[in-house]
Amino acid sequence: DFPPNTCCCICCFIDRMYQQNHFIISSNSNSSNQNKLVSSLEGKVWVQDVPSLHLLRFFLYEYRNWNSFITPKKCESMFVFLRDPFIHYVRYQAKSFLAARGTPLMMNKSQMLENSFLIDIAINKAKFCNALGHPISKPVRVWYLDIIRINDLVNHD
């Protein structure tokens, strides 16, 4: 496990790498280390929103066999979720949907899904939107349930 001072050193190192036009994700096989790393990033300026932290936890969980991954910032488009404030994260019937505004891949997928009547029925049943089409947001409840689900997935390795 990381002692608290090590988490601070990692955050300083990540900030320095980010300022030098590099992007870094560090991962160990121990999932508690990954959780501590992500939770230490929660206060950083360049990771501001909760959905990006969920996605980072998912990324670290899926690629936990990597020891480190450092790439030039010009390849940062793969990791647009870390700096894009327009991420939409929805959970419905134990499934997660992620969409980032402005990325061509997500735009194409959302246009394909827009033609599907099943999506409209699912959204209407789940009451994600009111009668005017505006989203009904419960960020605290969603955040809490997602943290519980992520912790359950991580602890059942």
UniProtKB/Swiss-Prot annotation:
InterPro entries listed in its UniProt record: Maturase_MatK, Maturase_MatK_N
Tissue spec. comment: Accumulates in latex (at protein level).
Alphabetized, the UniProt keywords read: Glycoprotein, Hydrolase, mRNA processing, Protease, Thiol protease
What's the biotech application? Has a potential role in leather processing industry due to its dehairing activity for animal hide without hydrolyzing fibrous protein. May also have application in detergent industries due to its stability and its ability to hydrolyze blood stain.
Relay the activity regulation note.
Inhibited by HgCl(2), iodoacetamide (IAA) and, to a far lesser extent, by SDS, hydrogen peroxide H(1)O(2), KCl, NaCl, ZnCl(2), AgSO(4), CdCl(2), FeCl(3), PMSF, Pepstatin A and EDTA. Repressed moderately by many organic solvents such as diethyl ether, ethy lacetate, acetophenone, butanol, trichloroethylene, tetrahydrofuran, methanol, chloroform and dichloromethane, and, to a lesser extent, by propanol, benzyl alcohol and chlorobenzene.
pH behavior? Optimum pH is 6.3. High activity and stability in the pH range from 5.0 to 8.0.
Q: Give the molecular function GO annotations.
A: cysteine-type peptidase activity
GO cellular component: a single term: chloroplast
Domain of life assignment: Eukaryota
Activity relative to temperature: Optimum temperature is 45-50 degrees Celsius. Stable up to 60 degrees Celsius.
Q: What PTM annotation applies here?
A: Glycosylated.
Q: What is its EC number?
A: 3.4.22.-
Q: What biological-process GO terms show up in the record?
A: mRNA processing; proteolysis
Q: What does this protein do?
A: Cysteine protease inducing milk clotting by cleaving casein. Exhibits biomedical activities such as wound healing, haemostatic and antibacterial activity, as well as agricultural application in biocontrol process against the infectious management of the root knot nematode Meloidogyne incognita.
Other noteworthy facts: On the 2D-gel the determined pI of this protein is: 3.4, its MW is: 43.67 kDa.
Which PANTHER family did the record assign? Answer: MATURASE K
Belongs to which family? Belongs to the intron maturase 2 family. MatK subfamily.
Record note on quaternary structure: Monomer.
Name of the protein in its database record: Cysteine protease Nivulian-2
Q: Which organism is it from?
A: Euphorbia nivulia (Leafy milk hedge)
